Amino acid sequence: MPNPTAAMLVIGDEILSGRTRDANMHFLAQELTGHGIDLREVRIVHDDADAIVAALDALRADHDTVVTSGGIGPTHDDITADAVARAFGVAIDVRDDARAILQAHYDRQGTALNAARLRMARIPEGATLIDNPVSAAPGFSIGNVHVMAGVPAVFQAMVASVLPTLTGGEPLLSQTLRVQRGEGDIAGPL
């Protein structure tokens, strides 16, 4: 039986412009491979709701699991949660449990939970929260889609939270051999 498949959707103008280097794909690939899930596709889209919805619809139809990275922060261009809600045809609003997590976090810091920060408590109807032990603002899962932050430390913590809930197959085992020959010399025997 073949292993389950996964896709990754990286969202952000900062990635496509070269201002920020994506560090999450390599990490996710390693984690999924170790869990017996084959990462088959990665797409990077800009901060545009139509582009996010189109990519998400295609990926979730073709793969067992989709992981998104980016676009769930407090700024005006963080539109991933809205796009995911649109893709699933559900409402989105500030959810009490997400708000309580953020309120407790900002109370501990002595910082106000302002309108911008409250945007991070907007969760599509029917989604379950993904724990964020790094900076509190939760990600969420809906259907076969797991929506995570783009900040690498937060992304990694969210992957650690979600991975045990995914059904894996046979992990890929590999070994590296160093050969002091050019590829053209060894291509035939391979």
Where are the model-predicted features located?
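Extreme N-terminal starter segment of soluble prokaryotic enzymes
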Residues: 2-7
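A C-terminal functional module that forms or caps the active site or interfaces directly
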Residues: 184-190
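Glycine- and acidic-residue-enriched helix-capping/strand-helix junction motifs
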Residues: 15-25
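Short beta->alpha linker loops
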Residues: 44-47, 97, 118, 181
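Proline/glycine-rich low-complexity loops and linkers
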Residues: 78-169
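Short glycine-/aliphatic-rich beta-strand segments at the starts of folded cytosolic domains
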Residues: 168-183
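N-terminal small/polar loop signature for handling phosphorylated ligands or for N-terminal nucleophile
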Residues: 26-79, 86, 107
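Active-site-proximal loop/hinge segments that shape catalytic or ion-binding/gating pockets
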Residues: 12
